[in-house]
A protein has these predicted regions:
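A structural motif
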Residues: 47, 52, 159, 216-217
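Conserved beta-strand positions in the central sheet of alpha/beta enzyme cores
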Residues: 1, 56, 160-163, 221
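Acidic/histidine-rich catalytic cores of soluble enzymes
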Residues: 79-201, 253-254
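Active-site acidic/histidine proton-transfer and metal-coordination neighborhood
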Residues: 7-134, 232, 256
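Active-site beta-loop-alpha junctions enriched in small/polar residues
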Residues: 2-7, 60-62, 108-110, 137-141, ...
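C-terminal helical cap(s) of enzyme catalytic domains, especially alpha/beta-barrels
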Residues: 231-252, 258
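A short, acidic, amphipathic alpha-helical segment used as a generic capping/interface helix at domain edges
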Residues: 199-213
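Short, acidic/polar
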Residues: 35-46, 144-152, 204-207
């Protein structure tokens, strides 16, 4: 995740705390981006040797600072950002194809894709590159007002991995809104916060049904964050919750079963 963030980001001193020293180096922004790209290519080749078929991560974004359109965005600035993304990621993804490995971008604020519209734009920028897909995580959609179930159907052939992670958002106004108000997580003044799986607002029943509909057979990976709960307890209960709510899809049409029985 963290190395991928540096491929497209506008690099500054914050990145030093999330990157290995051999990637950050002297901190020269373009040097950091190039070393990050090289590391991802090496990761794809390592995955091939281990028989791993999916690598999840971030892409970073040179235009995240433009997410709020003021001062007014200049013509071409957003297009330039997606062109930069394609220029940097196409060579990486070409190596993924050679290794028979797919990339799963966790659609997330600060990335080139952070909702349905921007995810589609990322695909278009890459001309539908076959190695590019998504690590689906509903917790980054719900509080934004993004249809997290529709995302599954819209990108059915590109759901490469699934994070089961929960989030809650308030039904009433709060002091710190969607943008967080520079307030730490687990603060009652926040509009939204991550929760142990099953304790937030995400409808996992709908997610399981949608994943079954698109015939997803990959893992349901619990990603756990809840500032009010003991980690061991939370991780344990979240795993059990996912096991309890998951179910296999039917291989028959319901009405057809009656016709079959009537013939017996």
């Amino acid at each position: 995740h963290l190395v991928g963030q540096a491929v497209c980001d506008n690099i500054d001193e914050r990145h030093q705390q999330i990157l290995p020293d051999y990637i950050y180096g002297d901190g020269d922004p373009e040097g950091v981006r190039q070393r990050a790209a090289e590391e991802l290519i090496k990761t794809a080749h390592a995955a091939k040797e281990f028989g791993v078929k999916v690598i999840n991560g971030f892409t970073g974004s040179s235009i995240w600072h433009l997410v709020y359109s003021f001062p007014p965005i200049l013509p071409g600035q957003i297009d330039d950002g997606y062109e930069d993304f394609a220029k940097r990621w196409n060579p990486i993804l070409d190596e993924f194809v050679k290794c028979d490995v797919k990339f799963g971008l966790e659609v997330h604020p600060t990335e080139i894709a952070f909702d349905i519209a921007s995810a589609q734009r990322a695909i278009d920028a890459l001309d539908g590159h076959p190695a590019f897909g998504f690590n689906y995580d509903p917790s980054h959609f719900g509080y934004q007002g993004v249809d997290y179930v529709e995302f599954i159907y819209r990108f059915a052939d590109r759901i490469n991995h699934v994070h089961m992670k929960d989030v809650s958002w308030s039904s009433t106004p709060k002091d710190a809104g969607v943008f967080g108000g520079h307030v730490d997580f687990h603060n009652p003044s926040r509009y939204w916060d991550f929760k142990s799986v099953g304790r937030g607002n995400i409808d996992f029943e709908k997610i399981i049904r949608a994943l079954n509909d698109i015939k997803y057979t990959g893992p349901l990976s619990v990603e756990w964050e809840d500032g009010a709960m003991d980690r061991e307890f939370g991780a344990t209960e979240s795993c059990q919750y996912v096991k309890d709510i998951d179910f296999p899809s039917s291989n028959i049409v319901f009405d057809a079963q009656f016709a079959e029985n009537s013939e017996d």
